[in-house]
Amino acid sequence: AAWFGGFPLQERWNHGYVVRWYGEPGLDATVYTPKVDFKFKNTTGNYLLIKPVVDKTKGTMTFQFYGTKPNWKVEAPKPTIDSRTAPPAPLYIEDPDMAPGAVVQFDWAVEGMNTTATRRVLAADGTVLRNDALKSRYYPWQAKYRFGPGFQPPAGAEVEWANR
């Protein structure tokens, strides 16, 4: 909401990995106590009500802004993906407590990427007030599996053997 509302961002940290249900890569923000935060400046000169909206079904939280309509317009195209990085080879972890030959995936591969989100904030008369860009780097993530005795992980996979 702060990005599309044209508010100047003062602090923003993207997630380390692409998390698809958080929305468009390049527009996410991490908030984590005590240091990682998301900050923007309210430049409207008026109060701003920020309403968090939680959707438990989708597992998402969004924010709605209410206040005096600012006298600027925002042009913000979809973020671009500047480069992609393939995920590492899958990791297979031997678990002697699992049934012989069993295998269970517990984490899924995600490619890494670098993205750029841009926006132009325009005055009512069309004068450009600000051109902004958000650069984000997301690291690749490997698929992870646990397997029981007797299972043979595929060639090329990273393997953690128990008691070897």
Task: Give the predicted meaning of each segment.
Residues 1-164:
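Well-ordered beta-sheet/strand-loop patches within structured domains
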